Amino acid sequence: MAAEALSENCDIVIECLPPQLFRTVGVSVIDRGKIFMPLSVGQLLEHWDLVERAKKTGARILAPTGALLGLDAVRAAAEGTIHSVTMVTRKPPSGLEGAPYLVEQGISLKGLKAPAKIFDGSAREGARGFPANVNVAAALSLAGIGPDKTRLEIWADPALSRNTHCIEVDADTARFFMAIEGIPSENPRTGRIVPLSVIAALRGLVAEIKVGT
């Protein structure tokens, strides 16, 4: 079955595709008014017109928490005023190799002996430069103050065996810090908890009781 034909036979389509296929599937699902659950949340930032299309067709776009934590607290804080959101991601070099940003900048991680900061910028810029690595930053930005105001640092650390994300949020209602150490899956660019997050999101659609925001 062609990817774009999935929406003809499904009520919910979960996307976990290479970036170049994101729009094809997204348009098909949204134009039919179905539920679109993208794991490549960073690609949603690049194709924001899909959100406008969803408003017209009645489709829903559900971004799962993925490898993050605390999005409920960020969303709640966003109902007031969030002053700043900063995320620091640290990954083993193998989980970052081949990222477009590294290729464009001519940065090699081979033989890295000590932690190295390889990116410092906005969540939007990070999602564009590391499309397979920091979809979590895109999700965080959508829950909070947006992709241009959310700050992101990415570090390559050869001493790590887990993908780590540390988040600091400063708001008028609270200041909080969150950290998670995710066990990588067979694909070192993502974590084992990501598919479980999708399952939890699907259960939430039909559960008798909903826990969390």
Please name every model-derived segment.
Residues 42-45, 65-71:
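Gly/Ser/Thr-rich loops at beta-strand to alpha-helix junctions
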Residues 15, 38-39, 61-65:
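General beta-strand structural signal in soluble alpha/beta enzymes
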Residues 20-28, 32, 39-60:
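Rossmann-fold NAD(P)-binding glycine/threonine-rich loop
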Residues 1-2, 63-65, 154:
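Short loop/edge segments at beta-strand edges and connector loops
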Residues 67-213:
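Active-site-lining helix/loop region of Rossmann-like oxidoreductase modules
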Residues 49-68, 83-87:
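Rossmann-fold dehydrogenase core element
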Residues 1-28, 171:
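N-terminal glycine-/serine-/threonine-rich beta1-alpha1-beta2 phosphate-ribose binding loop
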